[in-house]
């Protein structure tokens, strides 16, 4: 916006896809780290890291890097996606991940170690969350339905229909 450079439509969609994939990878890493910190390591942690690897494989397929992708550039993206990207992405988001998330939820929600160490710990009210400038999953976990992708959409988020995930701690 500052330099008045128009980003091609395809690049806007690719940016959105990559941002969402990074969000998934980040949430999987954070969830795995949380489980590990609670002492409930092994199965749930390995599930998180295994699924994160599948997302990182897509990054590597696209630009050769798994973590520091350096993909988004002024005016667009560094590379177009390879031909095999969309079939792998489709299998991941429409097959593997939904099943894995259900499986992971079952492993976490009923896990006695996690329940003993996390229940009623660090409960934050919506008012405190807002006053402390919490954002993202931390803010939404207090019941506040605010998401930057809806409040101030970038890329093509204004054209993507999604619900804001909200929890209540």
Language model regions located:
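Active-site bordering "gate/hinge" segments
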Residues: 1-169
